[in-house]
Amino acid sequence: MTDIQNKNYIIALDQGTTSSRAIIFDRDANVVCTAQREFTQHYPQAGWVEHDPMEIFATQSAVMVEALAQAGLHHDQVAAIGITNQRETTVVWDKVTGRPIYNAIVWQCRRSTEIQICQQLKRDGHEQYINDTTGLVTDPYFSGTKLKWILDNVEGSRERARNGELLFGTIDSWLIWKFTGGKTHVTDYTNASRTMLFNIHTLEWDAKMLEILDVPREMLPEVKSSSEIYGRTKVASPSAAIAGDQQAALFGQMCVRGGQAKNTYGTGCFLLMNTGDKAVKSKHGMLTTIACGPRGEVAYALEGAVFNGGSTVQWLRDELKIIADATDTEYFAGKVKDSNGVYLVPAFTGLGAPYWDPYARGALFGLTRGVRVDHIIRAALESIAYQTRDVLDAMQQDSGERLKALRVDGGAVANNFLMQFQADILGTQVERPQMRETTALGAAYLAGLACGFWGSLEELRGKAVIEREFEPQLDEAAKEKLYAGWQKAVSRTRDWEPHEGAE
């Protein structure tokens, strides 16, 4: 680290749900170069989603090489590497061969047997303990039940795990293990807090949760802070940051004080509100999770996950084929003065926070002969904003904090109609940053702080620039009337699908 002054770049590896990316930042936190590769989505059965871990590693390695080549840089000019990743996605691999024993089970995966696992946990009376200890709800979303499914269904795997032959990790653990040639098996607190196996109060793997899910302790990674040197990669640059994608975005937005919140608009929407050093227990369906403090140490956050955000627009394009491109939605939504009473509830894979209803299903309400395609497109965009309000209202009730402004990031924030409607339905200012790569930026910031590339949080705050502020324009009565219609529509979609095992 003595020659840090001669190294002028940080690489953020952003391993997402549909693609692997590498983003190179300079000392001013500007993007120098970006490389991206998509990888295959596997759907072996309805509701099942899997990735090939070897393809994830191959694409992530390739984009790092591509980004350096495009920028004309050599790896010895890189001070450190930061990793941010899709969370909850679960990998189990052979410690000797480095080969996965099964595909990665993705965070979106709702396989019916996994729902049965969750139902059994509830029947056995574990739901309250899970919430108190891990901050999570008993839902197939999290890693613990995915790991249990692998150990239950891959022959001999549980015994091999007990013998120390198999390792478990979320995507960050898998990548660092591969990048360090099998020398480092670690995760960070943010990713560990998404497994349903981790006690967020003692900051240790929880013995009772391991017993409940029958997970051998021997296969779990060591848990460390989000900002420290974990080991040298094969290209010699140190791996110096790990953060789950949403916690990385929260840090990249400089939401490091209690009461600050951000929403990332991606495939789903993910709202996090920093609650400082207090783990706020939710009474309204939020998750209590671990975030990054000012120097990557443990802080706490409330989180609400909306399962279908950008995927709703993809549905308009790919299944309904009423738009050619996602960017078309802003034009069509702006052609009509309102949605003409139409509400679209995109519960394609159930409802996330604050409802946590895996049996809800999507529906269109309020259709009349006067409804046009424009109204449906507008209703689709509005559904993203309504779901955001569902979550934010619950967060504010739990935390006792009244949000002054919502910071936003993700692909959909380029849609000015959506951002304005978001401000309108919240009655709160929405702040769109000039730097859109906030997830990667958060990983870069954490890596830079760990290796001395950047000296302080104050230095980083000076690099944050708001590109546009959206002020609420709807009056209170109009806002609440629209939202009441949304709540009515949501209530009609609840508990639609038959429960597993029900007659």
From Swiss-Prot:
Its job: Key enzyme in the regulation of glycerol uptake and metabolism. Catalyzes the phosphorylation of glycerol to yield sn-glycerol 3-phosphate.
Family, similarity comment: Belongs to the FGGY kinase family.
GO cellular component, one term: cytosol
Regulation of this protein's activity per its record: Inhibited by fructose 1,6-bisphosphate (FBP).
Binding site for sn-glycerol 3-phosphate: T17, R87, E88, Y141, D245
GO MF annotations in UniProt: ATP binding; glycerol kinase activity
Biological processes annotated in GO: glycerol catabolic process; glycerol metabolic process; glycerol-3-phosphate metabolic process
Segments traversing the membrane: none
PANTHER family the UniProt entry points to: GLYCEROL KINASE, SUGAR KINASE
Gene this chain is encoded by: glpK
InterPro entries, per the entry: ATPase_NBD, Carb_kinase_FGGY, Carb_kinase_FGGY_CS, FGGY_C, FGGY_N, Glycerol_kin
Reactions this protein catalyses: glycerol + ATP = sn-glycerol 3-phosphate + ADP + H(+)
Keywords assigned: ATP-binding, Glycerol metabolism, Kinase, Nucleotide-binding, Transferase
Keyword ATP-binding: yes
EC number(s) from the headed UniProt entry: 2.7.1.30
Binding of ADP, residues: T17, R21, T267, G310, G411, N415
Pfam families named among the record's database cross-references: FGGY_C (PF02782), FGGY_N (PF00370)
Binding sites annotated in the UniProt record for glycerol: R87, E88, Y141, D245, Q246
Binding positions (ATP): T17, T18, S19, T267, G310, Q314, G411
Pathway: Polyol metabolism; glycerol degradation via glycerol kinase pathway; sn-glycerol 3-phosphate from glycerol: step 1/1
Name of the protein described by the UniProt record: Glycerol kinase
Organism superkingdom: Bacteria
